[in-house]
């Protein structure tokens, strides 16, 4: 379609930056006096992070350190979905942190409706775990991007705008 401009709305994070943040967290935990003997372990997979410690207080401290390191590495805290701390073997405490990636269909519908209500000249389309917004005017698309940046606090996942053409 000649004259059509578009961009994609995705929710993703840099896996390597997360690996670096977890590594820095482990290093700081091993050198901090209050956490040195807390037996802290962090296990990272593609979809989740498991934090284990001797006490709930140590678990909270590790979580704070992790959030600080993630922010320094330009990772949004919205990617972390903290589960309830549960008891692990040996009197330890475990917390599973699910890593949010992609936009689920319910949220995609909500975002598409927000865009449609405010900007009738653009067409948002759901494509798997992303959203493509097309329109004739680049100015309209820029306005949609600015609108989404303003409303980012209402959206539970971090958004990135990619493939702007």
Swiss-Prot record:
UniProt GO MF annotations: nucleotide binding
NCBIfam families membership: PRK05412.1 (NF003819)
Function summary: Nucleotide-binding protein.
GO cellular-component term (any): cytosol
Domain of life: Bacteria
Organism of derivation: Chloroflexus aggregans (strain MD-66 / DSM 9485)
HAMAP family attached to this UniProt entry: YajQ
UniProt keyword Nucleotide-binding, yes or no: yes
Protein name: Nucleotide-binding protein Cagg_1607
Record family assignment: Belongs to the YajQ family.
Cross-referenced CDD domains: YajQ_like
Keyword Nucleotide-binding: yes
Keywords: Nucleotide-binding
């Amino acid at each position: 379609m000649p004259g059509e401009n578009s961009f994609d709305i995705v929710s993703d994070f840099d896996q390597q930056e997360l690996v670096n943040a977890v590594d820095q967290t482990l290093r700081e935990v091993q050198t901090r006096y209050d956490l040195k003997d807390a037996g802290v372990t962090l296990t990272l997979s593609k979809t989740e992070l498991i934090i284990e410690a001797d006490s709930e207080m140590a678990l909270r401290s590790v979580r704070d350190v992790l959030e600080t390191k993630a922010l320094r590495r330009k990772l949004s805290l919205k990617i972390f979905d903290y589960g309830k701390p549960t008891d692990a073997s040996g009197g330890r405490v475990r917390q599973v942190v699910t890593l949010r990636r992609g936009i689920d269909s319910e949220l995609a519908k909500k975002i598409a409706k927000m865009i449609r209500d405010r900007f009738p000249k653009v067409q948002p389309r759901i494509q798997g775990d992303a959203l493509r917004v097309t329109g004739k005017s680049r100015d309209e698309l820029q306005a949609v991007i600015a609108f989404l940046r303003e409303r980012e606090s209402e959206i539970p996942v971090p958004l990135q705008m990619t493939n702007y053409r």
